[in-house]
């Protein structure tokens, strides 16, 4: 359930002693399918637990999501179509089934198809006279108004929603909140706009969570980010948890927070904290359950369970709380098996007290790791398992009267309590008021009364002053859900803000986040000052005390600063109040007032000023004060000035506004100072930064020192290349030609410098004869780089074709995909003729892979050297053990795939490329062509990652056209780029990561 690199852990204890390949590491399982009865015998559970088959094919097909209704029946979305959706207007073969155990033997003896004709349904929630379900391309309310067990009304609530890019990352995990909203996960890679009938609208790309009203009226985003969340649950305090692939297996969601995702920045406040620091040996986590019941041994109370579809296990974590923050510890796996086809995609706690597991029983689970049309994908087998302890179960759920439903609000079983609450609010309605009033001090009764509009201010105040922390916590949540506060209600929240119980305090902070006002800045800043530690939260390593509360405080303070007049009132705050707290929160406020405030704070700021300067440059009304501050503050540190200028430049591009004269003047002085010859360890960096600033400003006064740099063989090669690049922007073509002709003509010129000249000169007619000679005399590997550079501009493309036509360069260059993509349209027919009947010398990738595998198995590799090769060849884009870039998928667990598969992924990266990692061809209005992976839109600019993994911000106004490709940004020439020894070393290093 993840992106291209899906790597799992070894099987572990269940098969630890077995020789041969690990069957649980294979993307395509090598074993044969088992019958349900045979599979049942493979499960390993703790002592006292029993697993039963609740349902299986042909009763159901592939189960996706499950949910219980008020009668204790299990609703499940079942698919035959996955992973290919049926075409619009075509009836699908998928369905929603209702499973019921009528005789109490633990097996579904009554299976009804409630709705069919669906199209890869995932999220499901039984509601009133029917069910709310996602089925491509809408979220539907399917209603049975005549009681015949089939929907006679199909109402579209929300849609159409995105599914075209990915059918395993859609709208799933429907979970009802205590306030009546329906929460959902939005998965990997799809682009979706969700609109409510009241005009509310959110836009989602890849992992996110959101909530909707069940009548289609309104939508709100809850959190931003995660890679591919699939699975959501609620705990007794009303906190939501999700299971995510790739970023972290478990999060406790903080409303308004940002979570790590591919290529997405946070909101200025940093990413929300994690619950666990381990990965459960896989990036394929699906389904999550918070156990709250009294039928299992006490050690399981408050545990989290997640499905791991790659290792075929149900993992378990115990929770300890640091204040209000859950801190998970990896516990022994709850369920293991010897059958690699077991795929636990969803977990639910039944009202009977049993754990229900949806088993997407399959040889293949990876959506990108294995071609979607692989014949080994099973379409029909699916099972649902039921796990009990010592035969203990709860009696059949009965919510038929208000009194019975109110009684269930005190059940030890979390699912029964939630079902009772929703049934009281949705079905019994006004008839339940009397029964609810009798125990309005119970927090769930209060929630039901609130949803029915019958909770009085006095009853809410009583709840807020209860001796029970759980009741006070829910009082804060109900206060947050109110549309407006009376003065007395605001005072209740202020009391909660200073409560001794951290959960109550955090709920009060969340309530304030929903009611922003300038008057709330002071109390929140004071509360934040008591808890906030200034070190940023780290993805790995030690955690701050109560990090979830700290992050919630930051979000809430940020929201107050968005209120009208909030920044104007800051000078009136107590002098001893730490302004750094407000400064940090202001980084999340995208207004001119925030930008101007941040500029005023710079002289007294502690720590790295980059985030403040970047944010101020993006939003402040007047940027000119930034220049003298930076120039004075870092007078002796030109490199720091350069770094801060580049941050400002990126922000200015995102803003779509040119730099002011004052800032350009400072940057010009900075560039000239950086270009002065010095003898120091950082001289190459100084010269490079100076050249890059001169290029960005097209600084004519820097031309002379840049000429000297470019011609001086004693200068660092990268700095000389930067000088060439800058001169190409500053000088007229004839003057530039005079500078670079000697460089191109010298056989002692370093290869990387020659490449820089070719890239810059490709668009300049005066240099084409020199480019012809350079291309003709270059080694084969460099010829390809030259060809790619030349193809990006019309003059260079002409030169490329003429050189090939003269027989001075091989026509095989024209078979390179990147060359073909960049060639101007007018020259493509000529290129096709020149390349006719030409074959790539290494066209048989399979033979190359086989040869590399044979060589590695014979010789092995040096892992220490492999670490160095990884840093040079891979770390710009890929992360391993938290180190490296995040342009491409992380490589944790890659070693469990085995040598053959890893070699395939390295040497044939274009075999099966996820949409999220396909690069685009960017045609600029100056006729330059670039190749890059679109990372994100940032205001009036787009951020791309180039082929070296470096991010570049390009103004939208400079882009003429973007054309997506089907290819990976990852180079496909590593077999040639790395020596056999280095390739083997890299492979050995990667295979260590299991």
Language-model segments: residues:
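Bacterial N-terminal signal peptides that target proteins for export
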Residues: 1-7
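Bacterial N-terminal signal peptides
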Residues: 8-16
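Beta-propeller domains with acidic blade repeats across secreted/periplasmic ectodomains
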Residues: 18-405, 415-419, 423, 474, ...
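C-terminal capping alpha-helices of c-type cytochrome domains
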Residues: 54, 129-131, 137, 831-844, ...
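Sec-exported extracytoplasmic/periplasmic mature domains
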Residues: 119, 144, 214, 410, ...
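C-type cytochrome heme c attachment motif
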Residues: 182, 354, 382-383, 448, ...
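C-terminal structured "cap/appendage" subdomains that terminate the fold
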Residues: 361-362, 535, 781-785, 792-801, ...
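Long, ordered, helix-rich scaffold segments
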Residues: 375, 379-381, 387-869, 887, ...
């Amino acid at each position: 359930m993840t992106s291209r690199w899906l790597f799992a852990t070894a099987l572990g204890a269940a098969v630890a002693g077995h020789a041969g390949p690990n069957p649980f590491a294979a993307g395509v399982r090598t074993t044969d399918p088992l019958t349900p009865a045979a599979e049942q015998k493979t499960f390993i559970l703790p002592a006292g637990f029993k697993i039963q088959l609740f349902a299986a094919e042909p009763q159901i097909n592939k189960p996706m999501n499950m949910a219980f209704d008020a009668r204790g029946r299990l609703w499940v979305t079942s698919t035959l179509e996955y992973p290919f959706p049926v075409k619009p207007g075509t009836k699908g073969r998928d369905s929603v089934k209702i499973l019921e155990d009528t005789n109490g033997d633990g097996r579904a003896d009554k299976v009804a198809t409630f709705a069919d004709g669906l199209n890869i349904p995932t999220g499901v929630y039984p509601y009133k006279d029917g069910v709310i379900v996602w089925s491509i391309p809408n979220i539907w309310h399917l209603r049975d108004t005549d009681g015949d067990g089939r929907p006679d009304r199909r109402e579209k609530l929300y849609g159409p929603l995105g599914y075209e890019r990915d059918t395993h990352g859609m709208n799933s995990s429907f979970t009802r909140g205590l306030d009546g909203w329906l929460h959902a996960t939005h998965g990997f890679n799809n682009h979706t706009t969700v609109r409510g009938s009241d005009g509310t609208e959110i836009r989602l790309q890849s992992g996110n969570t959101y909530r909707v009203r069940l009548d289609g009226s309104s939508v709100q985003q809850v959190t931003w980010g995660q890679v591919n969340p699939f699975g959501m649950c609620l705990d007794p305090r009303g906190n939501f948890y999700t299971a995510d692939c790739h970023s972290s297996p478990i999060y406790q969601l903080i409303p308004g927070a940002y979570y790590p995702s591919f290529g997405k920045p946070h909101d200025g406040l940093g990413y929300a904290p994690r619950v666990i620091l381990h990965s459960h040996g896989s990036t394929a986590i699906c389904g999550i359950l918070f156990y709250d019941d009294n039928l299992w041994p006490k050690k399981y109370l408050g545990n989290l369970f997640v499905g791991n579809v790659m290792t075929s296990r149900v993992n378990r974590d115990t929770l300890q709380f640091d204040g209000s923050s859950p801190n998970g510890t990896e516990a022994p796996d709850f369920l293991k098996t010897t059958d690699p086809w077991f795929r636990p995609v969803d977990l639910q706690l039944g009202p009977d007290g049993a754990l229900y597991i949806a088993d997407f029983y399959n040889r293949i689970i990876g959506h990108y790791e294995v071609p979607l049309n692989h014949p080994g994908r099973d379409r029909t087998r699916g099972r649902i398992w039921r796990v009990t302890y010592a035969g203990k179960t709860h009696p059949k759920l009965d919510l038929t009267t208000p009194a019975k439903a109110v009684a269930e609000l005190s059940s030890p079983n979390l699912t029964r309590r939630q079902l009772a609450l929703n049934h009281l609010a949705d079905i019994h309605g006004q008839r339940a008021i009397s029964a609810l009033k009798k125990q309005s001090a119970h927090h769930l009764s209060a929630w039901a009364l609130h949803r029915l509009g019958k909770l009085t201010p006095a009853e809410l105040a009583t709840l807020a002053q209860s001796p029970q922390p759980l009741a006070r916590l829910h009082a804060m949540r109900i206060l947050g859900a109110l549309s407006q506060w009376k003065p007395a209600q605001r005072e209740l929240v202020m009391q909660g803000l200073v409560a001794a119980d951290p959960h109550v305090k955090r709920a009060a902070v969340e309530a304030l986040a929903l009611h922003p006002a300038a008057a709330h800045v002071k109390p929140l800043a004071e509360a934040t000052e008591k808890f906030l530690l200034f070190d940023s939260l780290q993805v790995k390593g030690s955690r701050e005390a109560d990090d979830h509360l700290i992050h919630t405080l930051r979000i809430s303070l940020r929201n107050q600063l968005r209120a009208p007049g909030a920044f104007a009132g800051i000078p009136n705050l107590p002098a001893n109040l730490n302004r750094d707290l407000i400064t940090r929160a202001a980084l999340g406020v995208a207004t001119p007032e925030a930008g101007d405030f941040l500029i005023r704070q710079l002289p007294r700021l502690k720590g790295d000023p980059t985030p403040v300067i970047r944010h101020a440059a993006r939003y402040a009304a007047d940027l000119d004060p930034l220049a003298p501050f930076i120039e004075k503050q870092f007078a002796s540190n030109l490199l720091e000035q350069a770094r801060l200028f580049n941050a400002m430049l990126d922000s200015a591009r995102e803003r779509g506004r040119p730099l002011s004269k004052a800032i350009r003047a400072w940057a010009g002085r900075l560039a000239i100072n950086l270009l002065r010859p010095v003898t120091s360890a950082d001289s190459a960096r100084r010269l490079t930064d100076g050249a890059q600033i001169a290029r960005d400003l097209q600084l004519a006064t820097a031309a002379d020192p840049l000429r000297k740099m470019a011609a001086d063989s004693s200068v660092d090669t990268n700095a000389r290349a930067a000088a060439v690049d800058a001169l190409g922007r500053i000088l007229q073509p004839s003057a530039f030609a005079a500078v670079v002709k000697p460089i191109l003509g010298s056989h002692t010129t370093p290869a990387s410098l020659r490449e820089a000249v070719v890239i810059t000169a490709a668009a300049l007619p005066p240099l084409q004869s020199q480019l012809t000679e350079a291309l003709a005399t270059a080694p084969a590997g460099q010829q390809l780089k030259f060809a790619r550079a030349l193809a990006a501009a019309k003059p260079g493309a002409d030169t490329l074709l003429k050189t090939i036509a003269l027989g001075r360069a091989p026509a095989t260059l024209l078979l390179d995909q990147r060359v073909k993509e960049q060639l101007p349209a007018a020259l493509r027919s000529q290129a096709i003729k020149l390349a006719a009947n030409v074959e790539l010398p290494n066209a048989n990738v399979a033979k190359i892979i086989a040869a590399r595998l044979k060589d590695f198995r014979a010789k092995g590799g040096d892992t220490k050297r492999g670490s160095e090769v990884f840093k040079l060849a891979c770390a710009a884009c890929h992360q391993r053990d938290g180190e490296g870039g995040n342009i491409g998928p992380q490589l944790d667990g890659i070693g469990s795939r085995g040598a053959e598969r890893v070699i395939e992924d390295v040497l044939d990266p274009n075999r099966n490329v996820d949409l999220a990692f396909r690069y685009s061809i960017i045609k600029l209005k100056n006729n330059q062509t670039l190749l890059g992976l679109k990372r994100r839109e940032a205001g009036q600019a787009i951020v791309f990652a180039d082929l070296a993994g470096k991010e570049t911000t390009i103004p939208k106004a400079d882009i003429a056209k973007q054309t997506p490709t089907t290819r990976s940004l990852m180079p496909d020439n590593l077999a040639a780029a790395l020596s056999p020894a280095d390739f083997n070393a890299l492979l050995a290093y990667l295979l260590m990561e299991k």
